[in-house]
């Protein structure tokens, strides 16, 4: 999280095109996750951001979601990466909220995605025009 704070403050001066945050959600939840998601998304104005997270509050801010799974084939471990379609994003966020994707968790995930979309739209609207 310290690196996130530094990158947020120095984002205009940092020429690094891609920033990678691996499990930045460790030890946080709820509102803190929301703030981390907001800060990560703000970095996308000047960088490509890749983030591994298990926190729905952070995942909801992603513009694109990928699901990463390890599978074993003939005693070899393979990593499978799939880009998720919009309906799959809802199901995945519902899943990381608490296991099985129930009707309630699906509605909560839809609301979380909608709220993050509105936040991003509002934030972008208040940026100075170039």
Q: What are the residue ranges of the model-derived segments?
A:
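Conserved ABC ATPase signature
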Residues: 1-5, 26-30, 83-84
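GG-anchored amphipathic helix commonly corresponding to the ABC/SMC/Rad50 NBD signature/C-loop
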Residues: 1-19, 43
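Short, glycine-/Ser/Thr-/acidic-enriched flexible segments
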Residues: 7-9, 26, 73
């Amino acid at each position: 999280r310290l690196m996130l704070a530094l990158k947020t403050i120095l984002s205009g001066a940092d020429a690094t095109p891609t920033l990678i945050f691996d499990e930045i959600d460790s030890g946080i939840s709820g509102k803190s996750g929301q703030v981390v998601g907001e800060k990560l998304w703000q970095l996308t104005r000047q960088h490509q951001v890749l983030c591994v997270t298990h926190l729905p509050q952070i995942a909801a801010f992603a513009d694109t979601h990928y699901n990463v799974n390890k599978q074993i084939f003939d005693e070899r471990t393979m990593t499978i990466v799939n880009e998720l379609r919009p309906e799959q994003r809802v199901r995945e966020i519902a899943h990381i909220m608490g296991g099985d994707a129930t009707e309630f968790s699906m509605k909560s995930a839809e609301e979380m995605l909608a709220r993050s979309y509105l936040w991003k739209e509002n934030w972008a609207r208040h940026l100075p025009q170039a």
